[in-house]
C-alpha cells in the first residue's frame, strides 16, 4: 500500500486537528469492547478497559507517539516500526490481525470526531494509513 501526496497531506491534516491521545484511548476502548480477546495481553489493566482508565490511557500515550512518528515520516514507516514489530512479535506475541482491528476502531473514532469533515477522501486516506501501519507492524512476522 502506498499513499499519494494528497493522502499524506490529508492524514497530516486530520492528525493535527484531533486530540491524539484521546482518540487513541477511545479507539483502544472500542477494540477491547468489540473484540474482547484482544484484552488477553493487558492483564495488568485489571479488566479496566475504558478510555479514561489509567492503563488504557498510558498505552494510548505510547500508541499515539508511535503513530505520530509514523505520520511525521510517512516515507519510512517500515523502517521506523521495525523494532516495534519485533517487540510485538517476539516479546508480546500479538496477532497481526489486531493491528487492523485497531485501525478500524480509529476510523470509527475519527469519523465520530470529524463528523461532516470526514469525507470519503479522508476516510480513504486514513484507511490506507492504517494499512501501511499494519504492514509495518507485521513486517517482522514474515
From Swiss-Prot:
GO molecular function, one term: metal ion binding
Sequence positions that bind heme b: 59, 88
Location of the Globin domain: 2-142
Tissues expressing this chain: Red blood cells.
GO cellular component terms, semicolon-separated: blood microparticle; haptoglobin-hemoglobin complex; hemoglobin complex
Pfam entry (one): Globin
InterPro entries registered for this protein in UniProt: Globin, Globin-like_sf, Globin/Proto, Hemoglobin_oxygen_transport
Alphabetical UniProt keywords: Heme, Iron, Metal-binding, Oxygen transport, Transport
Highest taxon of source: Eukaryota
SUPFAM superfamilies in alphabetical order: Globin-like (SSF46458)
Gene Ontology BP terms: hydrogen peroxide catabolic process
Subunit relationships: Heterotetramer of two alpha chains and two beta chains.
Family named by the database record: Belongs to the globin family.
PANTHER family: HEMOGLOBIN FAMILY MEMBER, HEMOGLOBIN SUBUNIT EPSILON
Role description: Involved in oxygen transport from the lung to the various peripheral tissues.
Protein name (Swiss-Prot/TrEMBL): Hemoglobin subunit beta-2
Gene: HBB2
Amino acid at each position: 500500500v502506498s499513499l499519494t501526496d494528497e493522502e499524506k497531506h490529508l492524514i497530516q491534516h486530520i492528525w493535527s486537528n484531533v486530540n491524539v491521545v484521546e482518540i487513541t484511548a477511545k479507539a483502544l476502548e472500542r477494540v477491547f469492547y468489540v473484540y474482547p480477546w484482544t484484552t488477553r495481553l493487558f492483564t495488568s489493566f485489571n479488566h479496566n478497559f475504558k478510555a479514561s482508565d489509567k492503563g488504557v490511557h498510558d498505552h494510548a500515550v505510547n500508541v499515539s507517539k508511535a503513530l505520530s512518528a509514523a505520520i511525521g515520516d510517512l516515507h519510512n514507516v517500515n523502517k521506523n516500526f521495525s523494532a516495534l514489530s519485533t517487540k510485538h512479535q517476539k516479546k508480546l506475541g500479538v496477532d497481526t490481525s489486531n493491528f487492523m482491528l485497531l485501525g478500524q476502531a480509529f476510523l470509527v473514532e475519527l469519523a465520530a470526531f470529524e463528523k461532516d469533515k470526514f469525507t470519503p477522501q479522508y476516510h480513504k486516506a486514513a484507511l490506507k494509513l492504517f494499512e501501511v501501519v499494519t504492514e509495518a507492524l507485521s513486517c517482522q512476522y514474515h
